[in-house]
């Protein structure tokens, strides 16, 4: 709002010099934080203009949206990404869904990958938007055996269009409530890999002195009666928390036939489909992690900060190459000077003792990833997600399924 731009280097906060003090990012953040509505003055250096600018700002709450992206993939298909379930998630989701419905959306891809959960209420409210009146959403059973059954109302925003929910091994808790409600009601298809398997309701209790303890007070069950929670009574604490990693060792991450199915915990949906309890929710359409873009070329590299750091330096030193004002223009244009970009990045990796090979097999994925990182700097996370999704096998599976309808 005040005119700060991505890439500006903060030199001073009020009268406090911040540069050349070997401060960490957390040190800088702690200095920037303070009382709400308090005025501060920042002096920044902007390389593109080769000038120092001063901004008078007012501190305020930092928004942390839980709906990180929403847009129309094509004329008929919408996409919404939810990162976590917070107090504002349902409001954010409703705004996104209403916008997509106004654009005549017929199919929706709801992305819950990597979503660890959070508040239960917004998850129930979101599921309600997809289900017709009185359809079951979730069952919560307390420690004393009392069961509370939540059912849908008659006011859902998207009760009839086709629905695809993307999940993976890091989709947990409230994410699994939505996934279970959709699958058990035959409302849509789950695409991805088996979810985490956390179906416990926990209440946080203060102990004094800033300490807290979380007490388990209830369990979640899907509408058919499946327990979401992975069993933990016959395994060690370490083994329980290592279970997701163990899926790599058993082959489950590459082969859906390795997903453990408990024949004694078989449930049936209204349309006669068999679904299994025992921990986590298995997808209807499986995606191997080998099909994920990061697995195509050096998973460790993508998780490192090399590409992000290189792009920051590249955009800082050569701003004229990335002079885009319109996100649509940037989205539709190929990465500028791609051969020079690749050569410069290879050199940068060598200088950082991390030689990398970019070849015909991985070049397309690399350039798409690089373009997505640049999009964050220029336009924010929504455009970043749109670019990443162009090469996403989960998204492609959903689109292929829609085409086959």
Show the residue positions of the predicted features.
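A short glycine-leucine-enriched loop at secondary-structure breakpoints
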Residues: 1-9, 33-35, 181
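Short, well-ordered loop/turn sites that connect or cap secondary structure elements
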Residues: 4-5, 25, 269
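Conserved functional hotspot residues or short segments at active or partner-binding sites
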Residues: 227-228, 232-405
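Polar, glycine-rich mid-to-C-terminal structural blocks
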Residues: 174, 186, 193, 197-265
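Residue-level recognition of conserved beta-strand edge/terminus positions
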Residues: 13-14, 45, 231, 278
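Short, flexible surface segments
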Residues: 6-7, 209, 224, 271, ...
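Cleft-lining beta-strand/loop regions that shape enzyme active-site pockets
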Residues: 14-17, 21, 25-210, 219
């Amino acid at each position: 709002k005040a005119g700060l731009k991505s890439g500006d280097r903060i030199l001073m906060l009020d009268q406090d010099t911040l540069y050349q003090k070997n401060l960490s990012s957390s040190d800088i953040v702690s200095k920037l934080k303070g009382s709400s509505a308090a005025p501060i003055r920042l002096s920044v250096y902007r390389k593109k203009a080769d000038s120092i600018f001063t901004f008078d700002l007012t501190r305020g709450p930092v928004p942390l949206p839980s709906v990180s992206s929403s847009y129309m993939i094509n004329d008929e298909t919408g996409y919404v990404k939810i990162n976590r379930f917070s107090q504002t998630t349902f409001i954010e989701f409703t705004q996104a869904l209403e916008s997509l419905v106004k654009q005549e959306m017929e199919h929706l891809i709801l992305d819950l990958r990597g979503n660890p959960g959070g508040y239960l209420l917004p998850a129930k409210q979101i599921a309600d938007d997809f289900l017709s009146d009185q359809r079951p959403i979730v069952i919560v059973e307390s420690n004393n055996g009392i069961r509370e059954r939540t059912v849908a109302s008659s006011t859902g925003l998207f009760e009839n269009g086709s629905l695809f929910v993307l999940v993976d091994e890091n989709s947990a808790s409230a994410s699994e409530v939505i996934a279970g409600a959709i699958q058990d009601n035959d409302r849509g298809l789950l695409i991805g890999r088996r979810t985490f398997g956390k179906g416990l309701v926990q209440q946080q209790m203060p102990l004094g002195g800033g300490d807290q303890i979380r007490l388990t007070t209830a369990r979640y069950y899907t509408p058919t009666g499946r327990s979401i929670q992975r069993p933990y009574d016959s395994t060690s604490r370490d083994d329980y928390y290592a279970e997701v990693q163990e899926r790599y060792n058993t082959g489950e991450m590459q082969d859906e036939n390795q997903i453990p199915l408990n024949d004694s915990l078989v449930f049936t949906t209204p349309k006669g489909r068999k679904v299994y309890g025992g921990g986590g929710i298995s997808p209807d359409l499986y995606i191997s992690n080998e099909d994920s873009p990061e697995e195509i070329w050096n998973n460790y590299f993508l998780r490192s900060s090399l590409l992000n750091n290189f792009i920051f330096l590249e955009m800082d030193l050569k701003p004229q190459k990335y002079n885009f004002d319109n996100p649509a223009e940037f989205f539709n244009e190929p990465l500028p000077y791609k051969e020079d970009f690749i050569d410069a990045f290879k050199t940068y990796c060598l200088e950082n003792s991390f030689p990398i090979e970019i070849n015909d097999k991985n070049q397309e994925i690399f350039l798409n990833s690089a373009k997505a990182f640049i999009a964050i700097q220029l336009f924010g996370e929504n455009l970043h997600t749109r670019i990443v999704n162009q090469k996403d096998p989960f998204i492609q599976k959903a689109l292929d399924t829609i085409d086959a309808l």
